[in-house]
Amino acid sequence: MLEMIQALDEAALLWIQEWLRCPVLDTFFSAFTQLGNAGLVWLVVSGGMLLFPKTRRAGFWALVAMLFGLLCTNIVLKHLVGRVRPWLVVEGLTRLVAEHDPNSFPSGHTCAAFAAGATWARYAKKRWLKGLCIAQAVLMGFSRLYVGVHFPSDVLVGCAVGLSC
């Protein structure tokens, strides 16, 4: 079963590299994925939300969700599982950004994006804003695949952990 998942993961990454990569998207996704480094964008937005009474609760619970996600993904699962990054094992895969953590599973960027985005969406009053909250999380997850630093299964589990927080 794990061999089949690994084969599908590798095929998906090579397909993205072969059929979707282009200079415009390379620039966009390389920049977008960097927004998630250290959870900075979600910390800043959630911290800013604490300043306003209408958004204070959403900001607080997003920070709590991200903390739980950080504990699950970056502190426990990454070290417990120890899965190496895709560019180290997928022949022909080129990464577009540097990634210093050698552990791939699960995606911490995706976890934080979904933990924050789902929490913000729960408190958002407008439908378009709910969609935007989820869209940023989906884009972050996809960006991790596009730049070649995570396997699809890493991103899916990061999403699941983020949503469960």
Regions picked out by a protein language model, each given a short descriptive name:
Residues 45, 94-165:
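Membrane-embedded catalytic cores of phosphoryl/pyrophosphoryl-handling enzymes
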Residues 45-71, 130:
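Interfacial segments of alpha-helical transmembrane regions
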